[in-house]
């Protein structure tokens, strides 16, 4: 399938290191993580992928801490991690050490008390009773309505915020196949007027090939499971993909 966007040069043969800020240090803060940057650079890490850094919704929260993937604002920092200034310091230092930074982006849904639920309720899907809902049974999030073009532009504006204000280098897009592929095309086309970015999709390209016209990389789970089966059981059990 022909790609619609070029791959940024530094992303060829790169590696990606996932950062869970809450769990990475005893403090669970950006400032505490900052001290680890030289060590990570020395290890040969090239791209830091931060799991969601946005604040977590209170309504229907999972446990006492909540899920990173149920955000209450797309343009704020989770206060338990620190401030935008703290995160910008990480990006500046990472860049100085030759590393890039991408952030997790959750476009399909928000937390149940996201600021848009009050300011822009039309941004959300509703069930037959007229209530916000999630189609996949996740009870701490509600689905966004991608038929609403104003919502699409608001989402792109929020993504742009992190590029302009903090200088991030790309996005890891959570459950990317749940969001229409034409939105990702629209977002990439507009956002790369600012700078060329790296786009990583959480999806299997063997099952969602059309998305790879837009994304640079993805998770080939089907191939991974097939190769593991080959290792564990032998070639006679492998079916052609």
Task: Give the positions of each predicted feature.
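Substrate-binding/active-site clefts of carbohydrate-active enzymes
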Residues: 2-15, 22-31, 38-46, 52-166, ...
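Short, Asp-centered acidic motifs that coordinate Mg2+ and/or phosphate
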Residues: 47, 170, 198
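Carboxylate/His-rich catalytic cores and anion/metal-binding grooves
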Residues: 48-49, 215
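Short catalytic-loop micro-motif centered on adjacent basic/acidic residues
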Residues: 102, 170-176
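Active-site-proximal helices and loops of the catalytic beta/alpha 8
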Residues: 158, 164, 174-241
């Amino acid at each position: 399938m022909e790609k619609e966007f070029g791959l940024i040069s530094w992303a060829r043969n790169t590696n990606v290191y996932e950062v869970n800020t809450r769990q990475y240090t005893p403090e669970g803060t950006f400032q505490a993580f900052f001290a680890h940057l030289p060590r990570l650079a020395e290890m040969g890490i090239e791209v830091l992928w931060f799991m969601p850094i946005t604040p977590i919704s209170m309504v229907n929260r999972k446990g006492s801490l909540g899920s990173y993937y149920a955000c209450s604002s797309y343009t704020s920092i989770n206060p338990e991690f620190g401030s935008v200034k703290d995160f910008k310091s990480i990006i500046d230092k990472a860049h100085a050490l030759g590393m890039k930074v991408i952030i997790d982006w959750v476009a399909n849904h928000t937390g149940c008390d996201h600021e848009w639920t009050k300011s822009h309720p039309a941004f959300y899907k509703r069930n037959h009773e007229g209530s916000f809902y999630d189609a996949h049974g996740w009870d701490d999030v509600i689905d966004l309505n991608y038929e609403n073009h104003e919502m699409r532009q608001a989402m792109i504006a929020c993504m742009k915020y992190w590029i302009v204000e903090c200088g991030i280098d790309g996005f890891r897009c959570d459950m990317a196949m749940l969001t229409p592929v034409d939105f990702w095309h629209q977002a990439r086309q507009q956002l790369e007027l600012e700078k060329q970015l790296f786009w990583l999709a959480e999806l299997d390209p063997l099952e969602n090939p059309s998305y790879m016209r837009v994304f640079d990389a993805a998770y080939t789970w089907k191939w991974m499971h097939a190769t593991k089966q080959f290792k564990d059981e032998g070639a006679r059990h492998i079916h052609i993909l």
